[in-house]
Amino acid sequence: MIIRTCGVQSKNKKDMQERKKKIVRIISRLCISGTSVHVSLLSYHFNNDNWETILLSGVPGENEGDMIYLPKQYGIEPIIIKHMGREISLWDDFLAEIQLIKILKKEKPDIVHTHTSKAGTLGRLAAILTGVPQIYHTFHGHTFEGYFSPLKTKFFIQIERFLARFSTKIIAISERQKEDLIRFKIAKPDKITIIPLGFDFSRLLPYDNEFKLRKKLNIDKDKITIALIGRVTAIKNPALFIYSANEVLKQRNNVHFLIIGDGELTDDCKKLVNQLGIQDYFTFPGFIEDLKLIYGSVDIVCLTSINEGTPVSLLEAMASQKIVIATPVGGVPDFVKNGENGFLCDANPQAIAEQIIFCVDNFQNLDYLRKQAAEEVLSKYSMNRLFKDLENLYNSTPSKKSSNLFND
């Protein structure tokens, strides 16, 4: 089912519909992630008298969690590409490609905009083969370092370079990410445009100030709570967070640590906490949908990732006037300024523990930092700014009909 926004009845209603630009937006899967939130917001906004959006999504993995409810809350019913998933499978990917081609042939969109790697590959290829006039891809991160073997990485880079040649524009979400794309020669600089993420901050503000989550989890209200928020996967490096907590607990006991989220490493993390003997200072509440509950009970948010695009948990924390401590990876240094609106530190337990202890000991004196962080994030990462940037891009880019191999 495809949800289309109903306009006011008038004699010109048919003409208005004909003037609409149709977007097919494609994401690899609506798993628990900031990208799923981003895509849901865009699909909602670009459904009005001027735009029509169709959202296509693959299927989340077994331990990734499912956020398909989110676009539905905005009145968007995604079309599921049942063979498109996280893992590489020649047969499933081929079947997914066939389904994508059929949908694009039927819908004849003006624009295809893809998000995340698998959707970027299959979706753009289908758009190229069916002659879609405008093709965009947003990099929410990349897998060019630290993910795969050198041979496999080189292969994926070649695919991205090929697809970029047929893309109208490549979208980076930060200055540092654009620099990476240029460094790996994915596309020429003038083909890459920077559009930072934007968020519906009403989902987390004003946050709950009655410590409901702490009460539910039996966490002392006088303790400083430090959280890692997001999918519990290898790229998020949750073990580093746990080892850092262990170092902190050797020197301070007025703290409590949480890992908020689910993933394939959750059980391993629980085992590590038990092995270190710090289970009394650790809680695993799993995925929590209500952001106001989270940020009403968390004081410090850590990010220990190996790589990132623009991590949503940090932006949400900063908007909620929480202290953030992060490793300087991906696009993080583009918005976390060390000592000004948050803290950056090396990816080792001692360095992170030292920074946590500093923040715990000086918690009351860091109000200036929290307020500065909120002001910057709320102004730069608003969803209205995001919508305006994308509308300008879509409208200012000339449509160019590509070769069409599959339409009649």
Regions found by a protein language model. Give the residues of each.
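Nucleotide-activated donor-binding/catalytic signature segment of Leloir-type glycosyltransferases, i.e.
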Residues: 270-286
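A short, well-ordered alpha-helix in the C-terminal region of glycosyltransferases
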Residues: 358, 365-380, 389-392
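A conserved mid-protein helix/loop that constitutes part of the nucleotide-sugar donor-binding site
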Residues: 36-41, 224, 228-247, 264-271
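N-terminal strand-loop element at the rim of the active site
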Residues: 20-21, 25-33, 37-92, 177-180
